[in-house]
């Protein structure tokens, strides 16, 4: 149903919604985008509830809320979209409780359909070695190999990588300070090949970087490299190195996670390395099979092992 086809809501339903929108704006200070999203979700649900007989919010019980879930499934909505709807409804009903207009929140006992978790695609160790066997020695190629070694060697998100400044890197200790999701700071470790190639890049960085630029990785224009540039260059290297599957920054992070868990018995440690808030997010990489996991970072990561001086 399009917005302009919607029938006006009864005052008993519309007025509490308007008070909630004002609350989101004045007291919660949410962005306009988030406010619009709440409004769209709530008004879509309320239109449906009116059609099936709701006239006042005090009528709403868990059976009505389950109807909303079933309606979403009939419409072919993703489980995550239904969960977003339910979250919006819970927030609104909590507001009504806060105002003394409801006694309990009927949406709190209703769950969205379980989201089907698909296993992330990753490269195996041989494919990673093939991708990273970059022999070109120009500054851009060395930068690109340093980026790929670091993303795979530390399991970084793309946003984390491009936001790294020179001051965040302790090369000798193999440590980097990154800002992850939710603006949370964490320390990541890198060793072996990643440490070696970041060091090579740092020696050449001044050939490309503007004098005032603080970013670790810069573009050929001398400024901080963009997300899109990293994605494009990785895809190009995948083709050049004849790797069968499409290469993306996310795939390198997935490969880091999978390879670490295949060689390590420490799910919590890998959770910390990835910056996952919830361990369930990390568990997806285990294929629900923990029997073959063994031990942690320097011993586990195939490119973190230091070369023997006699090699």
Swiss-Prot record:
SUPFAM superfamilies: DNA breaking-rejoining enzymes, lambda integrase-like, N-terminal domain. Its main location: cytoplasm. The keyword Thylakoid does not apply. The active site is at 157, 181, 250, 253, 276, 285 (o-(3'-phospho-dna)-tyrosine intermediate). GO terms for biological process: cell division; chromosome segregation; DNA recombination; DNA transposition; resolution of DNA recombination intermediates. Pfam families: Phage_int_SAM_1 (PF02899), Phage_integrase (PF00589). This is Tyrosine recombinase XerC. It comes from Vibrio cholerae serotype O1 (strain ATCC 39315 / El Tor Inaba N16961).
